[in-house]
């Protein structure tokens, strides 16, 4: 005979019968579901490419926005130090510095390439 005291009823345990169904992963329209805060991914995914000039101008506008945002955070830190987190200041300074160095490197490479092209002729 089965000891009725030690036998657990599987139907009475709430978590054992409620198994969630896993749906199949559909990747047909994966790019449409991507969310971006910049237009760069959208431009890269589109068939029509932006001109080189437009790409450079957008990059410089982004760099300028980061520099301006950092200036505003710096002013706010001086006026009301308790309203700004030090971590935000540090991250903003690093991001602005990196974007400025990247822009400087791109300009230097463009000037060097232009000089190489003009001296070869």
UniProtKB/Swiss-Prot annotation:
Q: What are the GO MF terms of this UniProt record?
A: cytoskeletal motor activity; structural molecule activity
Keywords on this record?
Answer: Bacterial flagellum
Location in the cell reads: Bacterial flagellum basal body
Subcellular location, principal: other
Does Transport count among this protein's keywords?
Answer: no
Lineage: superkingdom: Bacteria
A GO cellular-component term linked to this record: bacterial-type flagellum basal body
Q: Which InterPro entries match?
A: FliE
A Gene Ontology biological process in which this protein takes part is: bacterial-type flagellum-dependent cell motility
This protein's record includes keyword Manganese? no
- What's this protein's family per the entry? Belongs to the FliE family.
Q: Which HAMAP family match?
A: FliE
What is this protein's name? Flagellar hook-basal body complex protein FliE
């Amino acid at each position: 005979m089965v000891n009725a005291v030690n036998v657990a009823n599987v139907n009475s345990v709430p978590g054992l019968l409620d198994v969630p169904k896993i749906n199949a992963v559909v990747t047909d329209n994966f790019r449409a579901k991507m969310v971006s805060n910049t237009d760069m991914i959208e431009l890269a995914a589109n068939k029509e490419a932006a001109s080189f000039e437009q790409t450079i101008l957008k990059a410089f506008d982004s760099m300028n926005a980061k520099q301006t945002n950092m200036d505003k955070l710096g002013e706010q830190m001086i006026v009301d130090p308790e309203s700004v987190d030090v971590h935000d200041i540090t991250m903003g300074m690093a991001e602005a510095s990196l974007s400025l160095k990247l822009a400087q490197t791109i300009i230097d490479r463009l000037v060097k390439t232009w000089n190489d092209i003009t001296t070869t002729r």
